[in-house]
Amino acid sequence: MSLSRFGAATLMLPLLLPGMGWAKEFAEPQVGEDVAMPAEAQDGTLPPLPDESRPLERGAPSEVAPTPPGRAPAPDELPVLPPLAARWGYLLRLEATTLTLLPRRGVGEDEGFIQLEPTLVIDGGEKFGFNAGARVRLRMWGGGEGAGLVRKEDWDSLSDWGQLVRALKLGADTSPVALWVGAMEGFHLVSGHLVQRYSNRTNPDYHPAGALLIGTLGPLYMEAFSSDVLGARLMGGELELDVQHVLFGRPKQPGRYTLSLSAIHDWGRGEVKSAEVTLAHLDATAVVLVQREGRRALEMHVFAGWGGRPGAGGAWGAVAGVGADSVTPTLDLRLRLEARRQHGGFRQGYFGADYELARLQAAGTSGLPLAHASFPEGYSVYAEAMVAWDAVLLGEVLQRHLHLSMGAEAFSWGRVDVDGRLAVQLLHRNLEVAVKGLAVGMRQPGARYLASGEVRWRFWGGRLYALGQGGTLLYPTAEGPLRPGAFASLGMGVDNGR
């Protein structure tokens, strides 16, 4: 498997960007530090999925020897640590915050809650991790006649119980078979041409647990996923064939020349029913440049593909592009640039950042669900960048002074879509700021905008922290149109992370 597999999954990413999932109006746990566990588990987060830690090894992220100020450690200064499997750890956390849900544009009423959020994390090393916990929102005011003590929208369906499992990992990136269960944020399915930057909790009243199964057998690599393990929603997978392996035997660098086929079906059940949709895509990828020197690597790849909507005549699309991945001890950079063609209502990245809202009501003035809304034929240019940087040594999740993920698509008929997330660590990692923005249908009537942010400040040796959050939301309604809202939260948390 080569570095160029841009897609893979990021089920654990919401834990890096707390509160940045639109559906999770209020934060997931964020950064703490070590309890004799690897840095990637220090804040209740588990080691990230392949999209965040691909086969190119950077080495262990923690226990770095002191380095003179202003100078990153040289490769030969980086420590050699015992296997992660030998370093079990745990984390306990409790957050207590006030939460206010506010109406926007004169629609709805405000509600107030006391929010309690316990968290338990068990880190079993490279092949096992578990993060459990859920928010309990106790009503202080609002909600209308008959409103209960606990906010019922958080627990009114079987799928909502999936929020108890924030992250479960069985197997490592290099295992023949591996399973991840939890929240999906910014998820790509391998090539990313069908499932691209998808988040399964964009709907603020829907809290499912998704799952990703990864398997490798000879020249075959497979990813199968479900957006909701307790409900009939998005299901599908992508099968990738290593052509060089088939023709010439096992290569020294697997995954340089591949063909892949993906298919996705939305059963449309979930908390709110919607139309069923099926899409398929065929892709070819070639890695044209590979440079490796010690713990530094650079890869460039080109790709092309064609997709369609089975059963819908004339619905097809084509794509071609180039990508680059670069990894050093302090930087992980991934770039992608694509030219796309859409025809008959098909588009690449159909299951994207906005999908859980768009399946109910697409951006624009039609008011129709995405499956029934018209999409003009034309061309587009898509660009995506993922940057992780640390001044000392890049860790898997927590040890990152900067984490940026952004995708943008501009269409020939005027529309522009942008999705981005940014998180920074300041003041010896005691201050953290995270923001997220989503804009769909810009430069067109009925454009959709969402934004949220969070600030966390650790003090008293890092065990106690203050946090504040705020942002905008869109709620589904029985009448059909999405209802705009906003939230604000302020509180404290304590854990044994330092």
Please report, for each region that a protein language model flagged, where it lies by residue:
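C-terminal structured domain segments
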Residues: 432-477
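Bacterial N-terminal signal peptides
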Residues: 9-18
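N-terminal periplasmic/intermembrane-space "pro-region" immediately following the signal or transit peptide
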Residues: 24-108, 117-129
